[in-house]
Structures are given as structure tokens and as C-alpha cells.
A protein has these predicted regions:
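Alpha-helical transmembrane segments
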Residues: 1-27, 57-87, 121-127, 134-137, ...
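Short, well-ordered, mixed-charge alpha-helical segments that flank or form enzyme active sites
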Residues: 97-98, 128-131
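Hydrophobic alpha-helical hairpins/lids featuring a short glycine-rich hinge
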Residues: 71-106, 110-112
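Membrane interface segments of multi-pass transport proteins and intramembrane proteases
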Residues: 96-106, 136-145, 307
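Flexible loop linkers connecting adjacent transmembrane helices
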Residues: 25-41, 95-103, 296
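Juxtamembrane helix-capping/reentrant segments at transmembrane boundaries
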Residues: 36-49, 100-113, 303
Length: 339
């Protein structure tokens, strides 16, 4: 358990210590944020703020994990999903930098690349020996829905949904980083409890979850260090690199914990953000009207003259409540029983 704590501390120290030089590097390279013309007017002031700060999160978390990991396939799979989704996000950021525009990698390429990530993740999950691999436990029940080969399609939806959901929420200073820390803390606590319960019951067939906890702690520490510089007014943005990486990490945890549907609660804020966009598009297309002033929904509250910090803190509170529900369901229905 000491490894878990040290991983978080190491990642946090690296992230905070390297932050100023990394931000200066981004400024020198003129890797600044491009702002959508149709976005809120007060976001114009954010133009040019260094972005792709997610690289700092990935570096700090990876170094801490490599230094303290037991190299179990469970933790390595989460690291793979995190880095792979981060690489897709970096490609998106790179196109924005080079073409000086707010749109990056095309949706078609993102889907193709995320499908490749999902296929490899499914293979690694199989190699890790997860029980009930191709079935999904329905939260609040003891029923497992058998998906068979469709499980691989399902985890693609989990990974793509989480990565893009966090990306949608990354529109206000501190919003995505703060909610991600809350979600990752929940998953890490789940991994720790599962490890403790499994360690006390040798008969349980459960891969070592300690590495999952180490990966989670490393990501939390790195994200906390990043938030130090991303809090309002932000000195740096995580960009698609960080947003997609953190979303991928959450999806990886949900898959390797066999708690895929709990992501609906633990990542509930991102689901709300994504649903707001879907509702807005559908109602405008078929009814010719808009439900929200602007989407994703955090922009709706901006248009209602809420301050950025008020929106950020309230979204953190919502994330905390939803994560508590997710954790309660995990404790009641997913945690291995005492013997």
C-alpha cells in the first residue's frame, strides 16, 4: 500500500516542479489555444494560453508508475489506454497548432484509432485473466448481461465515450482536471478495497489490483500538480492530449475492474456534458429550436452569467455526488464477498 501513496506523491511533485519550465517551453514554441469563433465572448481572452499541458500529466504519471509498479497486466493495460488515447489527443492538438485552427483530427480518424485502442485493450483484458470477461454486471442487481463478441464493441463505446466526454468538459479552467481527480480517486479506492479483500481471501480468482491503485494514484498526483497551474485563471490548458488521456484512463479502470456501467455514475459529469450536445443537435435538427443557450452544458451556465469558478465548483460537487453513488453500488454489488 505504501507504493500507492508514494506513486501519488512522486507524480504530484514532478508535475508541480516541472510545471513552470514546461509552460515556458509551450510559450516559446507558441503552442497556444485556438478559440472557437462561436464560443462565449469572454473566452477570447484565453486565446494563446499554452495548451497540450496533458503532456505534463502523462510524463509525471508514467514516471511514477514505472518507478513503483509491480508490472501486473491490469495496471499496464490502464497505462496503455491512457497513453494511447493521449497520443490520439496529441495528434489532434498538433494539427491545431500547425494549422492555427480550433479543429484538429477528423472524427473519422479518431473513431478508427480509438477502435484500434479498444481492440488491443480487449486482448490485454483477456490475457489478464479477468473473470466474466465478456459479460457486464448491471448495477443494482446480481445479473450479468452476456455480450459475447459484442463486448469488444461495447468497450469501444466505453473508451470512445469516456475520452470524448472528458474532452467536451475541458472548456473551463479547472473543470476537467478537478472532476477527473474525483473520478480517479473513486476508481483508485475501489482498486485498493478489491486488493485488500482479495489478499485476505486467496480462493478468490482476481488479478492483482494493487497495480491499478498505483496507476490511479500516479494519475491523481499528476492531475493535482497540473490543476495547480490550470486553476482559474489558467496558466495552461490540458488540451486534447490530457482530456482524452484522462478519459481513456477512466475507461481503462472501468474495464479492468469489470465495472463498466459504473462509469455512468463515476464519469457522470462527462455523460451530462455529452448528452447536452446530443440533445441540442437533435432538437435543433428536428424541432428547429435549442434547449440550451450553448453546449456543452457548462457554456449554457456561462451564458447565464455564472462565473467560471462557480460553474467549476458546482460541477465538482455534482461529480462528487455521482461518484459517491457509483462507489456505493460498487461496494454493494461488485466488491468480492468476505469469506
Amino acid at each position: 500500500m505504501t507504493r500507492v501513496l508514494i506513486a501519488g506523491i512522486v507524480a504530484g511533485v514532478i508535475s508541480i516542479a516541472a510545471g513552470p519550465r514546461f509552460i515556458d517551453f509551450l510559450r516559446r514554441k507558441e503552442l497556444g489555444q485556438q478559440i472557437r469563433e462561436e464560443g462565449p465572448e469572454r473566452h477570447v481572452a484565453k486565446k494563446g494560453t499554452p495548451t497540450a499541458g496533458g503532456i505534463l500529466i502523462l510524463l509525471a504519471a508514467t514516471i511514477a508508475f514505472i518507478a513503483l509498479s509491480k508490472y501486473e497486466l491490469t495496471g499496464l493495460t490502464v497505462l496503455f489506454v491512457t497513453l494511447a488515447c493521449g497520443a490520439i489527443g496529441f495528434a489532434d492538438d498538433f494539427i491545431k497548432f500547425t494549422h492555427k485552427r480550433s479543429l484538429g483530427l477528423s472524427g473519422r480518424w479518431k473513431i478508427l484509432l480509438l477502435a484500434c485502442v479498444a481492440a488491443i485493450t480487449g486482448y490485454l483484458a483477456h490475457r489478464a485473466g479477468l473473470s466474466h470477461l465478456t459479460s457486464v454486471l448491471i448495477p443494482g442487481t446480481s445479473y450479468r448481461l452476456p455480450l459475447g463478441p459484442l463486448w469488444y464493441v461495447f468497450i469501444f463505446l466505453v473508451i470512445a465515450g469516456a475520452a470524448n466526454g472528458v474532452n467536451l468538459s475541458d472548456g473551463l479552467d479547472g473543470l476537467a482536471a478537478g472532476t477527473a481527480i474525483i473520478s480517479l480517486f473513486t476508481f483508485t479506492t475501489m482498486a485498493v478495497l478489491t486488493f485488500i479483500r482479495s489478499a485476505r481471501t486467496p480462493s478468490l480468482r482476481s488479478p492483482d489490483k494493487l497495480d491499478l491503485a498505483i496507476a490511479g494514484a500516479a494519475l491523481i498526483g499528476a492531475a493535482v500538480g497540473f490543476l495547480w497551474y490550470n486553476a482559474f485563471p489558467a496558466e495552461v490548458f490540458m488540451g486534447d492530449t490530457g482530456a482524452m488521456a484522462l478519459g481513456g484512463a477512466m475507461a481503462g479502470f472501468a474495464i479492468m475492474m469489470k465495472a463498466e456501467l459504473l462509469l455512468l455514475f463515476i464519469g457522470g459529469v462527462y455523460l451530462i456534458e455529452a448528452l447536452s450536445v446530443i440533445i441540442q443537435v437533435l432538437t435543433f435538427k428536428y424541432l428547429g429550436r435549442r434547449v440550451f443557450l450553448m453546449t456543452p452544458i457548462h457554456h449554457h451556465f456561462e451564458m447565464k452569467a455564472w462565473s467560471e469558478t462557480k460553474i467549476m465548483v458546482r460541477f465538482w460537487i455534482v461529480a462528487g455526488v455521482l461518484c459517491s453513488v457509483g462507489f456505493a453500488l460498487f461496494y454493494l454489488y461488485y466488491l468480492p464477498p468476505r469469506v
